[in-house]
Amino acid sequence: MSESTAYTIILHGNDATGKSTLVPALRAAGEVIYARGDDDATLEDTIVVRSFDKFTLRLADDDRGPLPQSYTDKDGVQRRIVRIILDADLDVLQARLAKRPSTDQWESEKSLFYFRARFLGHQELAAYHGLPVINTGEKSLDETMAEIIALARNPETLALFSKLALRTLTPEDVASLADRRAVIAGVDYAKRLEDIIAAECGETSLFTPEDVRAQCLEDPGLVHALVNHHDNLHDAEAPLRLRQIVEGESKQIYKVESPLTHHFDNLVLVFLKPTIYSHSKQATAEISGLSAVRASGSRLFLEMLHRAGISHTYHGLSAHGLIWARSTEITQIETVYKELCAGTDKHSFFGMAADPNVTLPTGQYKRGPYVRFDWRNPNHVYNGVNPATHPFYHLMEASVGKNAFYDKYLTGRAKPLGDKCVPEELVHSVQAVEASVDWTTRIFFTIQHYLHQIGLEVQDGCVMLDPTGRIMWSEINQDCMRIKRRERTETTNGSHQGVFDKDVWRAGGSSVKEAILDKWTQLNGLLREHLAGRPFHENEMVAAFEPYGMHATEVLADKTLTLTPRYRALYERLATHDRSLLRSGGSADKAASERLLALMQEHIWQAIAAVPPLNGHDEAKRMVRLANTFARRVGLPPAEVSALSDADAETILGRTATPPGSKAIGVTANKYADKTDEFALAELGIKLLRPTGRCLRITYELVDQAKYTKAFGAGVTVHFVPTRPKDMPGLLAQGMLDGAVTYSSVMDNFPTVARLVASTPDADISLALIRRRGQAIDPHGWSADRPARIVAEHGRMVRAHLAGLGVSPTTYEIQHVLGSSESYLVNDPRETYLLCDAVIATGGTIQENDLDVWQVVKNKGELLVGLYQRV
């Protein structure tokens, strides 16, 4: 290798991303390579390997200098440094760590999430320094090695990463790479503009043809911008282009287009425009320097979210207001958090702020914080359309000037609209409601936790989430929340001294541009000082609770609040959430593995109860995922998992309980034993002789040979085994029993492992769905996002009955129990469960516990006692 092409590979990344596997493999392939733990200490100052990780222990800022690009080795050869960050999804990292003999606090779930966010999950260091990222969880070892080597041998592609590094990228660079006013050879711009005007400036256009022509006379370069943007014209030979795909009131969004790499295919570059807007005041402005302040604030709020394990699409931000973000699916929903009756609530709900039934004297809601949903409407409409979607809109705005454009076109022609509150029932079809409430609460409880520590509070705020409700994609800073001092003094009341949000500008408008810059900068300084003085690895990483959980505990303890059952249950769950648990005592995370086993058992019950029984596709998928995860956690190699075949199951299914000519029959030992004995005598020709005392052996007298032979066959001997009814199906499936005398309410709610040979109806008992006495039950009000919860022993029968009523199985959940299901309704002050099932004989239990029958699932005489023989 010549000096001009010599290079050294340096791998960085979170624990378990594959560094220790890749380094020896690449060295064996002839590469010069280093990674943390496998580096040359004498070269540390020259190439920066181990010390690179220290960047994850400090807050993100723009004071970090450049990394070395090359060095001279001991042989005097000048070598390029090829620096690559390795990544893998969190579950992959955890599965790999599960195979290690021990782990420490640096490898807990919360640590892996945080440092992945700082390294590359949100790619802060990768985005800042312009480093390529390779996901080792998606490729084999050979594929990963090939990708690393290909990158190392392609300086042109690596230069593209460097060019797009947030450390050096400026808004001017973005404008140059977008080159919206470029003159493309061979285009007749004047003629093409007239064609576009004719097509786009019709009845629903905010602009008349004369508006566009007049502005182009004042600004000739606008002609090129309008045509280029409309027709997506650009230099097709350019190795790198930024194509603007979206522009809004506060942001421009670009896609990277380059023939050199697909690395940026799932990323977007966001530019925060130096703008501010208030719908309530119908005012807008540009404030020089605001982009940098918003970006710095976003960095600090993202730091809080990273510490709490909350995902955001932002990878990294710069002081220029530039952001690398992951592309994601979005919805029209804005999720709003409210603690006080202020802002929109105060102005929309007349008198609510002073109503003692709704609010406290502090302005807080008596029922505590709540989350609502808004439909994101255009700020203005013109002739029934959103004028901002016009292909000329933002280019005309930039050319005319923001304030002049607003006055002439929006105030003068369009009508204000703005976002509107939307009922949850309408949100379900576009965004997961309960997950959105959960995650929005986590976001603002986390922020509240940190703000309280410096004497501030967030009173309300808004975020935007993906359809799952679990990934945030919107801006997060002072611009999207209301932040005040907790203790307002006489000197701050009536002034802006205790206000750190957009209310400063709402109150003063353009006259307070400098004031809002000053207040937002002050807030950034307070947050930075506090977070820098409490680094994650010394505080949250070793804490037993999450930031949002600690604030949830405070809210639960607030005696002035009367929380609703829905939110109390949410806060109780958040208060006990702990992501700091460590793996220990073996090669697997025992606690997680045990939980996986319990989940698999529960999903088996759900699959058993599927309607019809064989239509359990969704549950089958869930069980496969859980089983594969469990296999990884206990160290079973993937090759062994895939090698398992039907033959392994057939071996068990073919097992016989007893030798030919003999049968083992299970019979109940206690409840309904008298009914079992009566059936055996009447239908099987057998008188069961049950023991007394502690003896367990059951014998019998043969009373009717013909009935016995019909039931069991000629020449067959039978012995009886006292068995719990709910154990019978499993014992039959495993071949431990050949048959069982039991009820259809048992056998018909398990997988079909036996056939009914003989039976007698029981006219004394029925099966019913039970409710709290007099409670209204409307299955049509159940939904997938807010499903009804039902406690049931007889899941299959319950599902079949509800299906007969036309109730979708996606709108309710069955919690399987093995007995005393009524107790879950009786001892449930939060009313978590709506219904339970029960076998009813006299009805005494439901009467004494203030319950009644909602629906009869099986009438008296429809439940059978019978002999079931293994199939």
Curated annotation (Swiss-Prot):
Disruption phenotype: Impairs the production of cordycepin and pentostatin. Pathway: Secondary metabolite biosynthesis. Keywords: ATP-binding, Kinase, Ligase, Nucleotide-binding, Purine biosynthesis, Transferase. InterPro entries: P-loop_NTPase (IPR027417), SAICAR_synt/ADE2_N (IPR028923). Its EC number is 2.7.1.-, 2.4.2.-. One of its GO terms (molecular function) is kinase activity. Cordycepin has antitumor, antibacterial, antifungal, antivirus, and immune regulation properties; thus, cordycepin has important value in commerce, medicine, and scientific research. It is an enzyme of class 2 (transferase). One of its GO terms (biological process) is purine nucleotide biosynthetic process. Induction: Expression slightly increases by addition of L-alanine that activates cordycepin production, as well as during the development of fruiting bodies. Expression is positively regulated by the two key transcription factors Kruppel-like factor 4 (Klf4) and retinoid X receptor alpha (Rxra). The keyword NADP does not apply. Pfam families: SAICAR_synt (PF01259). Cordycepin and pentostatin biosynthesis coupling is an important point of metabolic regulation where pentostatin safeguards cordycepin from deamination by inhibiting adenosine deaminase (ADA) activity. ADA is not inhibited until cordycepin reaches self-toxic levels, at which point ADA derepression occurs allowing for detoxification of cordycepin to 3'-deoxyinosine. Nucleoside/nucleotide kinase; part of the gene cluster that mediates the biosynthesis of cordycepin (COR) and pentostatin (PTN), two adenosine analogs with related bioactivity profiles as both mimic adenosine and can inhibit some of the processes that are adenosine dependent. Within the pathway, cns3 catalyzes both the first step of cordycepin biosynthesis by phosphorylating adenosine into 3'-AMP via its kinase activity and the conversion of adenosine into pentostatin via its ATP phosphoribosyltransferase activity. This is Bifunctional cordycepin biosynthesis cluster protein 3. It comes from Cordyceps militaris (strain CM01) (Caterpillar fungus).
